[in-house]
């Protein structure tokens, strides 16, 4: 599965803690991240991560493009709800794309934990169905 990791500045430490805690599960998947988040997670975990631009410089939109191409399976976006973001329209667009394309989205550590644990159990079969044009064939 392709997993996006995004975190606002005040939530980057939460993302790092999360990635360390779930490193073994995340290691089995292809990881993508916005610039600084990806760098910090990679430094803390040693996991390979495809890094895009930072969020304000278009990284959110780059991940959004993968969502629109049905090439992203899960988005972990630790948002800071208490700080205004200069690129809020990009954030809203990314969340909208997750809704449009039925991509699971966690905006906090609690939800991310539920999604990643279920991913580990193999309960994300619906993504295979979506990728295969509505059939449950995985070949």
Swiss-Prot record:
**CDD domains for the chain:** MGS (cd01422)
Q: Where is the active site?
A: 60
Q: Which residue numbers delimit the MGS-like domain?
A: 1-139
E.C. number: 4.2.3.3
Q: Which UniProt keywords apply?
A: Lyase
Q: Which GO terms describe its molecular function?
A: methylglyoxal synthase activity
Residues recorded as binding substrate, renumbered to this chain, are 8, 12, 34-37, 54-55, 87
Q: What's an example GO cellular component term for this entry? A: cytosol
GO BP term (any one): methylglyoxal biosynthetic process
> InterPro entries from the xrefs?
Methylgl_synth (IPR004363), Methylglyoxal_synth_AS (IPR018148), MGS-like_dom (IPR011607), MGS-like_dom_sf (IPR036914)
The reaction(s) annotated as catalysed by this protein in its Swiss-Prot or TrEMBL entry are: dihydroxyacetone phosphate = methylglyoxal + phosphate
Note the PANTHER family from the entry: METHYLGLYOXAL SYNTHASE
User: NCBIfam families of this UniProt entry?
Assistant: MGSA (TIGR00160), PRK05234.1 (NF003559)
UniProt function note: Catalyzes the formation of methylglyoxal from dihydroxyacetone phosphate.
Q: Which family does it belong to?
A: Belongs to the methylglyoxal synthase family.
The name this protein carries in UniProt is Methylglyoxal synthase
């Amino acid at each position: 599965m392709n997993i996006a990791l995004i975190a606002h500045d005040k939530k980057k430490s939460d993302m790092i803690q999360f990635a360390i805690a779930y490193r073994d599960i995340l290691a089995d998947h292809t990881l993508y991240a916005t610039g600084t988040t990806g760098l910090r997670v990679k430094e803390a975990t040693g996991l390979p991560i495809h890094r895009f631009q930072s969020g304000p410089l278009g990284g959110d939109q780059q991940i959004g493009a993968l969502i629109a191409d049905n090439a992203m399976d899960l988005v972990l976006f630790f948002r800071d709800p208490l700080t205004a973001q200069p690129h809020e329209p990009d954030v809203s667009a990314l969340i909208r794309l997750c809704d449009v394309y039925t991509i699971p989205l966690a905006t906090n550590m609690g939800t991310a934990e539920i999604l990643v644990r279920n991913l580990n159990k193999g309960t994300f079969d619906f993504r295979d169905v979506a990728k295969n044009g509505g059939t449950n064939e995985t070949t």
